[in-house]
Structure formats: C-alpha cells, structure tokens
Amino acid sequence: KKQAFKSPKVNFIPDTVSHVNIEGQGYIPSLVVESGDIIEADYFVNTTGQNLKVKNVFNEQYDSIGDTLLTTKAVVYPLPYTNKREQFHPYTVAKTMKNGWRWITPTWERIGTGYTFSENHISVDQAIDEFTTDIGDKSIVPNVVDFRPRVNKQTFKVNSCSIGMANGFLEPLDAPGLALTNTVTFMLEKILSNYYSNFRDKSIKTNNNYHSITLTLANEAIKKSYKFWTTFILNQYKTCHRLDTPFWIDQKHVKWDDWTLAIKDLNAYCDLHKNDYDVMMLAQTIASRNIQFYTPVPKEIKPPQLSETLPPTQHHLDYIESFHKFK
C-alpha cells in the first residue's frame, strides 16, 4: 500500500467516508468524507474490512453463515522463536482445542499463533486461559478479534464492488479469504473492462442489459465460491474425531445440505469426475484425525522410477535465509 501511494498516478486522501450517495438500482455517483469534501468517481471499490464497529456506509447486505461455521472470535499473540531451526517450517499447524482450533504459523521474525473459538460455547476469559495454557505461558495478554461468518448478498453492483473482508468472511481455517479475494479481483478485472467499454453510454447507470447480465453471473459465481469454501471447511470439522465438548458435538450436527451440490460444482469446474472423486475420498484427502495439516519435507526421497537416492532437501530456514542475504 505504501508503495502504491508513492505513484504520481495515485491520489491518496487520508479521510473517513461518512456517507455514500446511492441512486436508483445502486449507482454511486459520489461519496462524502468527514472533512465535507465530495469525491466523485466512475467506479468504487469497498475494502473497509469487517470491523463490526465501522458504520456500514455502503449499505452492504449480508447472508449469515453462522449456523454452519460456529466460530466467532479469535485470540491472537505473536511468539518469539526459542529455537528457530526447529520451529521454522513452511506450513501452518492447525491444532484442535476444546472449543475450536489453534493455528501455529512461523514467519521470518516470529511465530504467529491464535485460537479460533465459538463465543457461544466459551467466554473470552476462558478462551484466553485455554490458549495461554496450551502455549505454556500464562503471562501473555493476547488480542481479541471479533468476526462473523457471512457473505455479501451482492458483491458486484452497477459501478461498485466489495472485496476482501468487506465482501464476507468465513473463518481462519485454510485462509479461504486469500483465495476468495483473488477470485473477486480476477472478476473485477473482467467487469471493469466491460464497464469502461460501455461507460460513455450513460444508460449503464440504469438500463444496460449486457452489464446487468454480467453482474448477475459474477455474483452467482462468487456465491458458489463462498458456498464451496464453507463446505470445504465444514468437512474438516465433521471428519475430525473429537466429540469431547459441546462445541465439537454441535459442529458435528450442523446441517450439510450443500455438500453434494458443492461436489458437483467442483467436478464441473475442475473436471474431477474423471478421477471419480466422492465425499468419502475427499474427506480422507483433506482431513486428518485432529485437523493437524502439515507436510514435512522428508530428508531423502526415493521415487519408484529412480534407483539412486536423491540428495537431502535443503532446510527451509536456509532456503529463506538465502533470499534475505540476497536483498
């Protein structure tokens, strides 16, 4: 972001949006900021995130997914390395907890970790106690993050769209927000190309059938993407063997009506039907006993077609460190 602001083609306005002027059928001619200025533009992109305390000036409407994905909060804290060579690895560990799961993600400077949990099954204080106990340090004070599993009813409108957490959020497991943001960005590129090729025709504000059809198809595709990721995450909860707390029991009994449809959509999109994928096969592929997903690199690899052992793999820490030295 800081690099983008340095471009002479970018006009950065440090202000807060107080009101969005919305005309018929959702067309936005301008918005008003707290300083009183009116900002006009051809197209607006809402990236305000999911801060529940921020006023919804874009009047976004959401469908809740909270009855399917039960987690609603996370406590997070950065940990220092105690033995970087042993703790630094190129994957995230997802560890089950009593009322959710904990992620452990090594970065270059620190270890990112947090506990995603359901506030309907445990209080924040109880979650912090469980989190700090699992870490082994009761003195730390983690930050508390609120979120709501939900998806925007209409990602793309006449001359605006929502992207990132402003468009919706599921939960941190598998970081689906990254993939979904990439999907919306890709579609936005296509829509802008169509939009500006028709923009001189002012009828696009109210009555441009081609543009309307494009938006309808794009919005339906985004909804299917969110539905697929929802069932993908839910599958990992359902195939986990934990049944020792009310949270895991409740998550096991969540309705799963969209799974068959999601599999059909996946097959249609990826042509996986050639591999005869089904529910059980996919469940065994993406879920382990305790939702601990990681793929440690073996020291030696012996492919069946090779008679000689390949040389040992370079340690991930040494590999990344070589890039830092190159800088």
Which residue stretches match the model-derived regions?
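Predominantly flavin-linked oxidoreductase catalytic cores and closely associated redox partners
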Residues: K1-E130, I135, T185
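Detector for Asparagine
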Residues: N11, D15, N21, N46, ...
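Short, Lys/Arg-enriched charge-dense amphipathic segments
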Residues: S35-N46, K157-D174, T230-L243, Q251-A262
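Broad hydrophobic/π-residue packing in well-ordered secondary structure
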Residues: I39, F44-K53, W101-T107, I122, ...
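FAD/FMN-dependent oxidoreductases across multiple families
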Residues: W108, F117-I233
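Long, low-complexity C-terminal extensions of enzymes
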Residues: K190-K327
